[in-house]
């Protein structure tokens, strides 16, 4: 499913609650801090984030992206070359029913840091 906005992703989580181990969004590239196990046992996170350089525009070259906003001459999008972050989710599932017991997100390297 394609979920552009957070409310669509939350709705998808509830649709699959109890039927899937995990529902995770990815489209916005920015990690959210709302990981939880839903009422019927599905792990949920609105957005896991991206694997890429956060000192950029969603992983792409910053100046080229800004030029596109102002319709200035720009090259095709190309990846930023800064230090990358690896963002993701770890889910602990019940081996008997396949549903989530616990969900944790992580951020490793780069500009972003986990907030305790």
Predicted segments — roles?
Residues 2-3:
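Active-site rim beta-loop-alpha module in soluble metabolic enzymes
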Residues 6-79:
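Conserved beta-sheet core of the metallophosphoesterase superfamily
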């Amino acid at each position: 499913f394609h979920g552009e906005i957070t409310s669509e992703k939350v709705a998808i989580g509830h649709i699959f609650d109890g039927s899937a181990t995990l529902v995770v969004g990815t489209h916005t590239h920015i990690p959210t801090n709302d990981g939880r196990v839903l009422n019927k046992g599905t792990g949920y996170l609105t957005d896991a984030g991206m694997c890429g350089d956060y000192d950029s525009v969603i992983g792409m070259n910053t100046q080229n992206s800004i030029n596109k906003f102002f319709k200035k001459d720009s090259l095709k999008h190309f990846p930023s070359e800064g230090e990358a972050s690896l963002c993701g989710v770890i889910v602990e599932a019940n081996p008997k029913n396949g549903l989530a017991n616990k969900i944790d997100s992580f951020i490793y390297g780069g500009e972003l840091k986990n907030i305790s």
